């Protein structure tokens, strides 16, 4: 029985490639994943895609797997304003670059509803040709005037429900227990644990 299970195991090159060029994002992923998934980071030039978050994340995983020729993990992050029916959503990066933190607040100036949610979509592909699996994490909150350090995206303007601090004001350990990224990665970790992947090195499997 054990031999049959071993034969059925999916063998992956070690480590998995996490595609990012963002040092802060990499720092958070390392803190959340720990040693549970062997991975390395790599910055790739992937096309900027449009569509729904899950579709964008999956397509990025397909493209990255082709470039890396191996297993990859990619992430797409959204900040969605309920008053704007989900915008900026996956386009938050460009909204932030053009408008800044104050501009993001100004988008909601005419609305009483300041509620929003942070959404993280991690997609994992075992390699070229494999259908990516996507894991979604969502944290509800609201948009507030910027507070805290301004060195990590829109963190200063997002205050999660149940807290009086913005993401930027929170201790890293606290944020990493409740964030959209944490929730998505918790599902990734569960998948890897359940799948029982075997990682292969040049010297054989471990």
UniProtKB/Swiss-Prot annotation:
Source superkingdom? Eukaryota
UniProt subunit comment = Homodimer.
Q: Does the keyword Nucleotide-binding apply?
A: yes
**Matching PANTHER family:** INOSINE TRIPHOSPHATE PYROPHOSPHATASE, INOSINE TRIPHOSPHATE PYROPHOSPHATASE/HAM1 PROTEIN
Q: Where does the chain bind Mg(2+)?
A: 48
Q: Any idea of its EC number?
A: 3.6.1.66
Catalyzed reactions: ITP + H2O = IMP + diphosphate + H(+); dITP + H2O = dIMP + diphosphate + H(+); XTP + H2O = XMP + diphosphate + H(+)
The Gene Ontology biological process annotation of the record reads:
deoxyribonucleoside triphosphate catabolic process; nucleotide metabolic process
Species whose genome carries this gene: Arabidopsis thaliana
Task: List the subcellular locations.
Answer: Cytoplasm
Q: Chief localization class?
A: cytoplasm
* The name this protein goes by in its record: Inosine triphosphate pyrophosphatase
Q: Which InterPro entries match?
A: ITPase, ITPase-like_fam, RdgB/HAM1
Q: Which Pfam family would be a valid example here?
A: Ham1p_like
Functional summary from the UniProt entry: Pyrophosphatase that hydrolyzes non-canonical purine nucleotides such as inosine triphosphate (ITP), deoxyinosine triphosphate (dITP) or xanthosine 5'-triphosphate (XTP) to their respective monophosphate derivatives. The enzyme does not distinguish between the deoxy- and ribose forms. Probably excludes non-canonical purines from RNA and DNA precursor pools, thus preventing their incorporation into RNA and DNA and avoiding chromosomal lesions.
Q: Where does ITP bind?
A: 20-25, 60, 76-77, 93, 152-155, 175, 180-181
Q: Which cofactor does the UniProt annotation name?
A: Mg(2+); Mn(2+)
- Cite a GO CC annotation: cytoplasm
């Amino acid at each position: 029985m054990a031999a049959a299970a071993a034969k059925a195991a999916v063998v992956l090159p070690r480590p998995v490639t996490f595609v990012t060029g963002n040092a802060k994002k990499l720092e958070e992923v390392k803190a959340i994943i720990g040693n549970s998934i062997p991975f390395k980071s790599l910055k790739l030039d992937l096309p900027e895609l449009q569509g729904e978050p899950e579709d964008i994340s999956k397509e990025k995983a397909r493209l990255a797997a082709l470039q890396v020729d191996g297993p990859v993990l990619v992430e797409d992050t959204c900040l969605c304003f309920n008053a704007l029916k989900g915008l900026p959503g996956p386009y938050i990066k460009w909204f932030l670059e053009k408008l800044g933190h104050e501009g993001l607040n100004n988008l909601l100036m005419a609305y009483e509803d300041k509620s929003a949610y942070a959404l993280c979509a991690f997609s994992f592909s075992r390699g070229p040709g494999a259908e990516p699996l996507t894991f979604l994490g969502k944290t509800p909150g609201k948009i507030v005037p910027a507070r805290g350090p301004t060195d990590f995206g829109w963190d200063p303007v997002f205050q999660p429900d149940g807290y009086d601090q913005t993401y930027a004001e929170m201790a890293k350990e606290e944020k990493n227990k409740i964030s959209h990224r944490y929730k998505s990665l918790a599902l990734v970790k569960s998948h890897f644990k359940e799948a029982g992947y075997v990682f292969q090195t040049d010297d054989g499997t471990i």
